[in-house]
């Protein structure tokens, strides 16, 4: 019942170039194993070893793109996870902070990093946000507190507010890309869903 994706809703209704996939599912329930499978040829059906799998940055580079990876999820340990290993293969890799903790920086901290992208090149950019990850009430600034929280700080209202903030962020990325970077395509997906009563 929450109108927490107004920009996406408008684009869905008014822009024939936008494609939305309903009933999408994740290949796993946690970030690292999901992105291993979503961003490489490894998948839940054959479970090819990650280190033997081409990833999306490998493919983009082979196609002649200059690659960038910007993340608000922390480094995790530079060589400790598949995500960090994949990110480090980009031509440019930047994190909003250099450790893994649930970020105290809002995802908009990634927006200035887009200004470092050379618009004269063919660019492939991965932007890894915190989005609506647990501790939803920590994921958005006060001005996005549209719905008053109930008795639980990580309940539906906080989750809806975090979705509203992500919707705004996507609009900023899209607008900047169209105006400054010759944006040709943009894909957004959540790496996994959330069970609000279990916080994951």
Residue ranges, per PLM feature:
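Metal-dependent active-site segment of extracytoplasmic phospho-/sulfohydrolases and closely related
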Residues: 1, 165-200
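Active-site-proximal alpha/beta segments of enzymes that process anionic O-linked groups
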Residues: 1-146
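Residue-level detector of functional hotspots within protein domains
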Residues: 24, 149, 154, 172, ...
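Active-site rim elements
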Residues: 44-47, 154-163, 174-175
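Non-membrane alpha-helical structural segments and their capping/turn regions in soluble enzymes
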Residues: 108, 160-167
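A solvent-exposed, charged loop/short amphipathic helix patch at secondary-structure junctions
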Residues: 140-160
